[in-house]
């Protein structure tokens, strides 16, 4: 079913109506992407009930996505808030102007992280990059010269993606990478356009790395560093059918990357902004 190359079973539910169908053909229909099959003759009330069930499924999936967004937004960790506030208090005695700058960045970070639009199913790369920049500006103040930030981003790159997909990866790189090294270290964010509708995102750090045994648990709910990673991986699979790629070497660093392939009908960041204004 070609339509499944552009729409998932949740994005566009499909009900097949047929005069006659055997078991093997049913299997092929479901395997091709059908949500339900209705065989003739059928009563109008059954037809409407099947349609309502598919609509309810789509609505429930959308609600679940919004709940996931709210959950991710709630993952701003108390220790981060505590550390930022302590940094601001310390700076008020040393550098009032710097304290003001950090306060502004902190305000921007909270505002964008809890932006109402972030509870929707989609955002844009540039919006997420703004959140990342505010977050890193705060952390660079806290870590001073112990944190180096590198960017390798195509100049005009922008695309649609689920919100809060990249910032948690950057936060993990700082928290579990750079902060674990006595002399500090670096993190690097790479964003490249691979083809017309394909984008490659990678977050790297030169922290202590992760053992092969722990790498197996990275996308489970039982590993501390996986807070947010499992959720990101699930949403990535739902959004474009790909998964997070994790590579780590003990004492050398960690790399987490994703390949985002957009369907022709996904839309553009400009269309997203136009929708938000209406």
UniProtKB/Swiss-Prot annotation:
CDD domains: HATPase_YpdA-like (cd16955). SUPFAM superfamilies: ATPase domain of HSP90 chaperone/DNA topoisomerase II/histidine kinase (SSF55874), CheY-like (SSF52172). GO terms for cellular component: plasma membrane. It comes from the Bacteria. GO terms for biological process: signal transduction. Residues 1-55 form the Response regulatory domain. This is Putative uncharacterized protein YwpD. It comes from Bacillus subtilis (strain 168). The lineage of its organism: Bacteria, Bacillati, Bacillota, Bacilli, Bacillales. The gene is ywpD.
């Amino acid at each position: 079913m070609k339509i499944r190359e552009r729409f998932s079973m949740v994005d566009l539910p499909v009900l097949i109506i047929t005069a006659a169908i055997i078991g093997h053909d049913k299997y092929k229909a479901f395997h091709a992407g059908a949500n339900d099959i209705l065989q003739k003759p059928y009563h109008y009330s059954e037809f409407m009930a099947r349609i309502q069930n598919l609509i309810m499924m789509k609505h429930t999936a959308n609600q679940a996505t919004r709940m996931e967004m709210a959950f991710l937004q709630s993952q701003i960790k108390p220790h981060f808030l505590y550390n930022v506030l302590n940094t601001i208090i310390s700076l008020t005695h040393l550098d009032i102007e710097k304290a003001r700058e950090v306060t502004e960045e902190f305000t921007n970070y909270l505002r964008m992280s809890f932006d109402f639009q972030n509870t929707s199913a989609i955002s844009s790369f540039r919006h997420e990059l703004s959140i990342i920049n505010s977050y890193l500006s705060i952390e660079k103040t806290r870590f001073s010269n112990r944190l180096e930030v590198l960017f390798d981003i195509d100049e005009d790159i922008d695309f649609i993606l689920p919100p809060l997909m990249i910032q948690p990866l950057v936060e993990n790189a700082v928290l579990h990478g750079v902060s674990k090294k006595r002399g500090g270290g670096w993190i690097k964010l790479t964003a490249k356009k691979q083809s017309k509708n394909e984008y490659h995102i990678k977050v790297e750090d030169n922290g202590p790395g992760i053992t092969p045994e722990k790498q197996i648990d990275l996308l489970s709910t039982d590993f501390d560093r996986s807070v947010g990673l499992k959720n990101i991986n699930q949403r990535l699979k739902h959004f474009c059918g790909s998964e997070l790629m994790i590579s780590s070497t003990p004492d050398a660093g960690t790399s987490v990357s994703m390949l985002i392939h957009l369907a022709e009908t996904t839309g553009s960041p400009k269309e997203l902004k136009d929708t938000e204004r209406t």
